[in-house]
């Protein structure tokens, strides 16, 4: 399978996941710890670029975007998502509770004490996935 990662990067990441130190990996691979550190750093950078690429693509193909305004009660967000997805005839893959958990994990910086303190965008994809985006970034694109 094609990837943005080299075989060496994949091997290093797998060994790190298994708990090996960079020093141990360097010894096994016959190289320096500094080299392993650089390989791991580049792998993580490539992963971040791949994630950003997918986010850009998903944003382009997204049929539905919702601006969550400042002052919105977080508990109202699932209903807003479900209403918008019903309008677009999209089945969202999450329950209200799962959406709340998703919002808690991905939009923490926009929320304080259950209230939205900074607007943000929720994107609903055709496949029912949802994403959170910064409102200012979205505004800059348009």
UniProtKB/Swiss-Prot annotation:
Superkingdom as given in the UniProt entry: Archaea
InterPro entries xref list: RNA_pol_sigma70_r4, Tfx_C, Tfx_DNA-bd_arc, Tfx_DNA-bd_euryarc, Tfx_DNA-bd_sf_arc
Keyword annotations from UniProtKB, A to Z: DNA-binding, Transcription, Transcription regulation
BP GO terms, sorted: DNA-templated transcription initiation
Ranges in a coiled coil: none
GO molecular function terms listed in the Swiss-Prot or TrEMBL record: DNA binding; DNA-binding transcription factor activity
SUPFAM superfamilies (UniProt xref): DNA-binding protein Tfx (SSF89915)
Family: Belongs to the Tfx family.
Function: Putative transcriptional regulator.
Name of the featured protein: Putative transcriptional regulatory protein Mevan_1098
Organism whose genome encodes this protein: Methanococcus vannielii (strain ATCC 35089 / DSM 1224 / JCM 13029 / OCM 148 / SB)
């Amino acid at each position: 399978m094609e990837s943005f990662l080299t075989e060496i990067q994949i091997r290093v990441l797998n060994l790190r996941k298994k708990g090996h130190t960079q020093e141990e990996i360097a010894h096994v691979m016959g190289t320096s710890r500094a080299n392993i550190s650089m390989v791991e750093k580049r792998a993580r950078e490539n992963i971040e670029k791949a994630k950003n690429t997918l986010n850009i693509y998903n944003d382009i193909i997204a049929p539905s975007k919702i601006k969550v305004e400042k002052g919105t009660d977080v508990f109202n967000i699932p209903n807003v998502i479900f209403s918008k997805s019903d309008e677009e005839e999209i089945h969202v893959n999450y329950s209200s509770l799962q959406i709340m958990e998703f919002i808690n994990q991905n939009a923490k910086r926009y929320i304080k004490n259950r209230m939205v303190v900074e607007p943000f965008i929720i994107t609903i994809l055709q496949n029912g996935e949802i994403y959170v985006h910064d409102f200012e970034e979205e505004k800059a694109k348009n």
